[in-house]
Design a protein with these regions (language model features):
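Donor nucleotide-sugar binding/catalytic pocket of nucleotide-sugar-dependent glycosyltransferases
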Residues: 134-151, 156-175
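Glycosyltransferase donor-sugar binding loop
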Residues: 202, 226-241, 259
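Acidic anion/phosphate-binding donor-loop and adjacent secondary structure
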Residues: 151-152, 168-189, 207
């Protein structure tokens, strides 16, 4: 079933809900780039339902709350662990979620990925996710394309899954030349220009984004271009970080910015680019692609998950293999070379 708002989704479970607990924490300081803030923005502004953003350590709060007040709801996003430290905290999370359900609380679970990006502990993740899928009152996904994938993976009926589109990111459009000059003044490392076409890979630096392959494919090309790789290096991704430095340090066509990009600089980054490349090895939904669309960027991305719905979008080029990715890159370079 497709719905138009979280309010509609929640009302279908309980018309008298007065408190929604959200996990993980909403980053209220990033109202233009934080997915969770944008998803709950209407409810936050309306202020009729209290939105309680909860950390891992504060899970006990929603358990205590539902014990005294049934007009509450738990909206959980993701449910993953990446290392020993986070796996040790998982039993506490699961106990709190289980007790909350036992005491009569309703759960909405938003599925963002069928597998963790780092693909660690896959069988354990699958068992936990199937348990969560059974426990949830409603499972939320961002596209019709995800319904069958989530239903078959977690062995649940499609009727338990609600579709609410990914929130849009507000865009601040700036003339490209202005954006490039300002971006270079902040991150250019002495550069005076960005030669078109400007390819962009942005967000946290991580292996699942296929950055190694993008570098290898572009480095073989002769036409001029610029590749910007911008974002903070995620925990455990030092090997990838070192690879990028080693492969690009002598290539003036690549600008590597391994740093957190402040929200106010995203308009410069997006407006300065021509094409955003997303080389995910596996994906269900992507906030990065939604942001690129907000800035009217051309997009190269895999034919997977929610992205399959973009197959007829003239601004999007979808690929099924490394060869098709290479073809898209060469076609883009040829287009710019020929004016």
């Amino acid at each position: 079933m497709e719905i138009s708002s979280l309010k509609e989704l929640y009302s279908g479970l309980n018309k008298h809900i007065d408190t929604v607990f959200v996990v993980p924490l909403i980053r209220f300081d990033f109202p233009k780039t934080d997915y969770l803030y944008l998803l709950y923005e209407d409810l936050i502004d309306e202020n009729k339902v209290k939105i309680e953003s909860i950390s891992v350590f504060a899970h006990f709060r929603f358990v205590l709350h539902v014990f005294f007040n049934r007009n509450t709801l738990l909206h959980y996003h993701w449910l993953e662990f990446q290392d020993v430290k986070s796996i040790l905290g998982m039993p506490y999370k699961l106990i709190c979620i289980g007790l909350y359900k036992l005491f009569g609380g309703d759960i909405v679970w938003t599925v963002h990925n069928l597998k963790p990006h780092d693909k660690k502990y896959l069988s354990l993740h699958l068992r936990i996710h199937r348990w969560m899928a059974r426990l949830a009152s409603i499972i939320h996904v961002h596209s019709e394309a995800s319904v069958s994938l989530v239903s078959s993976t977690y062995d649940i009926p499609p009727g338990k899954i609600a579709v609410l589109k990914h929130p849009d990111f507000p865009a601040k459009l700036v003339p490209q030349e202005t954006a490039r000059n300002e971006f270079l003044s902040l991150y250019g490392d002495g550069r005076k220009e960005l030669k078109s076409p400007v390819f962009l890979v942005f967000g946290g630096i991580s292996e699942y984004k296929g950055i190694r392959e993008i570098i290898e494919l572009l480095s073989k090309q002769k036409p001029e271009f610029t590749l910007i790789i911008a974002g903070y290096v995620k925990k455990g991704q030092e090997s990838l970080h070192n690879f990028i430095i080693e492969q690009t340090i002598d290539d003036s066509r690549v600008l590597y910015v391994p740093a957190f990009i402040p929200e106010e600089h995203y308009p410069l980054l997006l407006n300065a680019s021509d094409i955003c490349i997303f080389n995910y090895d596996e994906i269900l939904s992507s906030g990065g692609i939604k942001m690129a669309q907000s800035y009217n960027k051309k997009i190269i991305a895999p034919y997977a998950g929610d992205l399959r719905e973009l197959k007829n979008d003239r601004m999007v080029s979808l690929f099924n293999s490394k060869e098709e990715l290479q073809t898209s890159i060469i076609s883009t370079l040829s287009h710019y070379s020929n004016g």
